[in-house]
């Protein structure tokens, strides 16, 4: 039975992604309420996962979970369930009990969560076959804890299982080194410029010179680009917050040439809904696909400084590079940098500069080279 449970989960993924069934699930909840029972009485495991993922907490639709966030939630929760099933013997999970209750989630006990916790810390599912990074553990723990707490609040499970899941606090030393200097950025850009690879060059230049998130660039349309003494690009960031990115004259020309080579003219038109950054098929780039492509672009340069880095240079690394260059080359203050990057909290902006500033302010750099 426990094996068919996993198969059923895999088959039902399209259902979990579709928000059309919210009303039907809530009708079942209403029936239970009218009978004086808890809301989740008549729901199955999959339905409670569905309701948790699609739960609307705000009357303003823009403030509720976005599609990508929902996908991430579904993926993590299903991984949690599949882990429980695949390691049932190790976790001492009783398959007969699961069948009797027709529910995995209602069968879970505190010791199952503690064993899952130990497994999560040791499993080699991370980058390069290593254990998960602390930041990844923190993300998984926060999400599963939130889900288990939700099940307890809605009385689907009796025990507060979320209290058994250990926290994974991310300290400064746990964060990957995403610093990238001006010289390193120029070496990467120079590699593709010298080889005349305009598309790769334009994408990397766009990331480095605007500080944009890759998803922001992938969703921009021609109508979002306008000229007001300088070129400005309107992007929609996290939380649907809109801000403008400065586009240099040189970057604008590169974007125009990239579009021209792919069969598109660039006329600033507020009614043009077509993508600004067009892929080979003339469509919007998929942000995850492009993000992977950017990582590959960097690897293929085989630049010497990349061999000594602990972590690969990714699209996100260029946001850190932008922050460092803004402070080093442009003397930007923290508040203006926060606004430009679209950070909600200035602490996030500080994290971007943390390692760089500690190295820059290390007093040893002022005299140690003289000790020869």
Segments (PLM) and residue ranges:
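Basic, Lys/Arg- and aromatic-enriched nucleic-acid-binding interface segment
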Residues: 186-214, 241
């Amino acid at each position: 039975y426990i094996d068919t449970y996993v198969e059923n989960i895999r088959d039902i993924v399209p259902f979990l992604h579709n928000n059309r069934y919210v009303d039907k699930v809530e009708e079942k909840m209403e029936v239970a309420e009218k009978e004086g029972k808890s809301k989740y009485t008549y729901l199955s495991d999959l339905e409670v996962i569905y309701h948790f993922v699609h739960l609307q907490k705000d009357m303003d639709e823009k403030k509720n979970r976005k599609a990508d966030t929902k996908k991430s939630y579904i993926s993590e929760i299903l991984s949690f369930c599949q882990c429980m099933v695949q390691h049932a013997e190790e976790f001492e999970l009783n398959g007969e009990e699961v069948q009797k209750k027709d529910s995995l989630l209602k069968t879970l006990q505190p010791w199952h969560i503690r064993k899952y916790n130990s497994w999560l810390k040791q499993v080699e599912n991370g980058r390069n076959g290593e254990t998960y990074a602390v930041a990844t553990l923190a993300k998984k723990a926060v999400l599963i804890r939130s889900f288990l707490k939700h099940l307890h609040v809605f009385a689907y499970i009796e025990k507060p299982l979320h209290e058994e899941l250990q926290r994974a606090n991310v300290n400064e030393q746990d964060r990957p080194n995403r610093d990238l200097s001006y010289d390193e950025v120029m070496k990467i850009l120079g590699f593709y410029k010298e080889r005349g690879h305009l598309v790769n060059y334009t994408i990397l230049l766009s990331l480095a010179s605007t500080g944009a998130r890759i998803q922001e660039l992938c969703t921009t349309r021609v109508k979002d680009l306008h000229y007001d003494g300088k070129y400005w690009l309107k992007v929609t960031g996290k939380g649907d917050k809109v801000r403008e990115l400065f586009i240099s004259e040189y970057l604008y020309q590169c974007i125009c040439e990239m579009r021209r080579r792919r069969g598109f003219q660039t006329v600033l038109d507020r009614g043009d809904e077509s993508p600004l950054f067009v892929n080979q098929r003339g469509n919007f780039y998929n942000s995850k696909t492009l993000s992977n492509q950017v990582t590959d672009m960097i690897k293929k340069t085989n630049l010497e400084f990349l061999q000594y880095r602990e972590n690969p240079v990714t699209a996100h690394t260029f946001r850190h590079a932008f922050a460092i260059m803004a402070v080093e080359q442009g003397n930007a203050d923290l508040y203006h940098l926060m606004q430009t990057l679209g950070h909600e909290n200035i602490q996030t902006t500080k994290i971007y500069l943390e390692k760089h500033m500690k190295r820059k302010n290390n007093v040893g750099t002022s005299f140690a080279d003289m000790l020869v």
